[in-house]
Amino acid sequence: MGGDKENLDLSDLNASLPAAAAALSAEDRAGLVNALKDKLQSLAGQHTDVLEALSPNVRKRVEYLREIQGQHDEIELKFFEERAALEAKYQKLYEPLYTKRYNIVNGVVEVDGGNDEPASENAAEGKDADAKGVPDFWLTAMKTNEVLSEEIQERDEPALKYLKDIKWARIDDPKGFKLDFFFDTNPFFKNSVLTKTYHMVDEDEPILEKAIGTEIEWYPGKNLTQKILKKKPKKGSKNAKPITKTEVCESFFNFFSPPQVPDDDEDIDEDTADELQGQMEHDYDIGTTIRDKIIPHAVSWFTGEAVQAEDFDDMEDDEEDDEDDDEDEEEEEEDEDEDEDDEEEKSKPKKKSAGKPKLPSKGGAQGGADQPADCKQQ
């Protein structure tokens, strides 16, 4: 067994990972792999120590359980493959609908009767009467979402008004997915498409390896992710020119400059690894929100209907939690009442009994149970 321990590497953990991967899939969360190699190797050593501590008979049973787990993982692998094929099939069915949406949003085509329909009494006169398509469609849709609204700063909005479409697609080499943001010609940057790509460790395990974003070609003085501070020189200073300092500030466009994992994980201490993992999870949360919520249901976010639907779901979850809390409180009250009854019985003077002793009450006493700076318009 000692030799096995020395030869154990990360690949020996694969048999124990699918269950964790499934949990991550349910919550749609991402893990930071490179920074956790040391922890995984430590777990590998613990895994070997556990087996060594078992008696031969128990160890044999555990090994058989691991064989059963391997059979389970093979079935799970087929599930992942079939799910990917099913998603690809329906993605093709969605595409024509997304094309129609693009054409309407950007004024490429007009909806039948769109120019003839009388305006409602609540419609703002002349505000968008001459506008093509649906102005600020994607900006409004994203701002309505709670996760994305925290990322979009006021100074980002003029640039995001030029956003024409958002698409996503799976990638195969390496496995993962990408988001494409299509922009009209604008005064902020040269790029017509900004892309964010997520590389996954394995095609079947939603564990994030790294994220890559397009380098934005900002026009001079238009970089929304930076603010320029000018400080006047001190009186009597030989340098009469103002001191200029550039600082990174909060902006939605920081999404295209994701946190990077160092190639050598030995350079990362535990606190830095935890901070980096939090940043990557947040970045992945933004990406999957756009992929899974905004793109497929954009008009519902534009109108606010999606928020109402999410609020309704949250209310149902809260009601279930409240019911569980009420049940717990009732059980605690019953336990307290039973404890009080027991105390009263104990405090009463005992009488001699010629018969059998009374059994204790069935309800006996129970045991108790660094952020970037805010940017102002340059």
Curated annotation (Swiss-Prot):
Which SUPFAM superfamilies would you find in this protein's record?
NAP-like (SSF143113)
Could you tell me which Pfam families the record lists for this protein?
Answer: NAP
Q: Where is the composition biased (Acidic residues)?
A: 308-344
Propeptide ranges are 376-378
Gene Ontology cellular-component annotations: chromatin; cytoplasm; nucleus
Q: Where is this motif: Nuclear export signal?
A: 54-69
Give the Low complexity compositional bias ranges.
356-378
| Primary site of residence | nucleus
User: Which keywords has UniProt assigned to this entry?
Assistant: Chaperone, Coiled coil, Cytoplasm, Lipoprotein, Methylation, Nucleus, Prenylation
State if Lipoprotein is listed as a keyword: yes
Lipid sites, type S-farnesyl cysteine: 375
GO terms, biological process: double-strand break repair via homologous recombination; nucleosome assembly
Q: Which residues carry this modification: Cysteine methyl ester?
A: 375
Q: Where is this region: Disordered?
A: 306-378
* InterPro entries for this protein: NAP-like_sf, NAP_family
Coiled-coil residue windows: 33-87
Give a GO molecular function annotation for the protein.
Answer: chromatin binding
Q: Which PANTHER family match?
A: TESTIS-SPECIFIC Y-ENCODED PROTEIN
Family of the protein in this entry: Belongs to the nucleosome assembly protein (NAP) family.
Q: What is this protein called?
A: Nucleosome assembly protein 1;1
Tell me the name of the encoding gene.
Answer: NAP1;1
